[in-house]
Amino acid sequence: MSMTTKHNWTKDEIIAIYNKPLMDLLYEAATIHRQQHDPNVVQVSTLLSIKTGGCPEDCGYCPQAARYNTGVEGNDLMTVSQVKAQALRAKSNGSSRVCMGAAWRNVKDGEEFDQVLEMVRTINKLDMEVCCTLGMLTENQAQRLAEAGLYAYNHNLDTSEEYYKDVISTRGFEDRLQTIENVRKTNVTVCSGGIIGMGESIEDRAGMLVALSTLNPQPESVPINALVAVEGTPMEEEKPVEIWEMIRMVATTRIVMPETQVRLSAGRTNMSREGQAMCFFAGANSIFAGDKLLTTPNPDVNEDMKMFETLGMVAQKPFIKIMQPKTVEAADSQFAPLGEKPKWSRPGHTIERNIEASIKSKI
């Protein structure tokens, strides 16, 4: 039913949808949702931080940036067997996807990347969808991940191109788009979304949805995060997002990207079950489960399963939309590492609150 998908949404059109009376917005979103998806099925993904902290970037929301003092303990890359154990646990808890996150600016060819490729092979062989979020990557690196059996690659746009400059100064918005472009040259699906509650306007939220919805095909998954303001980060003072904003954002995302999995991501601990149920009604059909999301608290998986039971919802099986990728063993790989790293722009502007948080961390 992809004939309903439109790739030329304008910012004004999206703002008009977002601002509709809530009952109309919910009705429209729920109608589209039911045409494309089973409303009682929700995908459960588990996020694993395979390498935490110590990142050289300055993202204003992020407790893993080395320059901010947030109490995050940096650690080394997890071993393949540790990851396998976590994936098996996730599978037994109803997850159909494992997303592995490394706090890297970009992928570097070498031992650590080889280890990540082995993790991808291992999880794909457990018959689970594998997703990675490892920062920027080259086309060759994307090909090697695809060959290992990667199902999805996550690279969030975070916000609109305009507001991006107030969040991050160590790379540009166009660098995000380039990595997504590199992933799309392979058969790996794209997962890309953003964060609300960073001080952005509704125009910025719409701008982010323009950037995502004009991709063709549209992303397979779009995570919608509510900022969790962490002490020590530049955004520690931001007020929590109201549940109505989350519901509107989910509904609007569903309307402009009918076939996408819309994922409730960070910030669910601050949402009541009623609030989450309204998000599911509005078109959210994916959640992150597990005790924490990288470094942020998350509801207990048993609580989530109880909520599903209350709502009469079931967890989605893996590989419903796209067939399971085949895994090619390292020895049979068609792609040699090129020893290259992604190029990125250095925008050169400064962000006052990021600098202040960085100075404060040294005191």
Curated annotation (Swiss-Prot):
It catalyses: (4R,5S)-dethiobiotin + (sulfur carrier)-SH + 2 reduced [2Fe-2S]-[ferredoxin] + 2 S-adenosyl-L-methionine = (sulfur carrier)-H + biotin + 2 5'-deoxyadenosine + 2 L-methionine + 2 oxidized [2Fe-2S]-[ferredoxin]. Residues 40-268 form the Radical SAM core domain. Its cofactor is [4Fe-4S] cluster; [2Fe-2S] cluster. One of its GO terms (biological process) is biotin biosynthetic process. Keywords: 2Fe-2S, 4Fe-4S, Biotin biosynthesis, Iron, Iron-sulfur, Metal-binding, S-adenosyl-L-methionine, Transferase. Gene3D superfamilies: Aldolase class I. Binds 1 [4Fe-4S] cluster. The cluster is coordinated with 3 cysteines and an exchangeable S-adenosyl-L-methionine. Its EC number is 2.8.1.6. Pfam families: BATS, Radical_SAM. [2Fe-2S] cluster binds at residues 99, 131, 191, 263. [4Fe-4S] cluster binds at residues 55, 59, 62. GO terms for molecular function: 2 iron, 2 sulfur cluster binding; 4 iron, 4 sulfur cluster binding; biotin synthase activity; iron ion binding. It comes from the Bacteria. Pathway: Cofactor biosynthesis; biotin biosynthesis; biotin from 7,8-diaminononanoate: step 2/2. Belongs to the radical SAM superfamily. Biotin synthase family. Catalyzes the conversion of dethiobiotin (DTB) to biotin by the insertion of a sulfur atom into dethiobiotin via a radical-based mechanism. Homodimer. This is Biotin synthase.
